[in-house]
Amino acid sequence: MIVTTTNSVEGYQISEYKGIVVGEAIMGANVVRDVFAQITDIVGGRSGAYESKLQDARETALSELEDRARALGANAVVGVDLDYEVVGQSMLMVSASGTAVVIG
């Protein structure tokens, strides 16, 4: 499945729009607390443990986005946008949204 932030896929024509799809992942309170507890992991102002958790959440959100697009019969998702939101006091939500399409 092709997933892109652009509104089209070079070399392909969009033949059908299937609708908006969204994938989400939430890092729970314990994960965020554990990451900040490992602050000694910081090198050059960056936390490897925190970045790893963010990457996992981003990959989960994108995987869920692809699964939902496949369920609609799409073979690509265009116009993908990633958002990061703090939920409550100690949770982080990563959401990926885009338009499921059929390209050929």
Curated annotation (Swiss-Prot):
Coiled-coil features, chain-numbered ranges: none
Pfam families to which the protein is assigned, alphabetical: YbjQ_1
InterPro entries cross-referenced by the UniProt entry: UPF0145_dom_sf, UPF0145_YbjQ-like
UniProt similarity note: Belongs to the UPF0145 family.
Name of protein: UPF0145 protein TM1040_1243
Lineage of source species: Bacteria, Pseudomonadati, Pseudomonadota, Alphaproteobacteria, Rhodobacterales
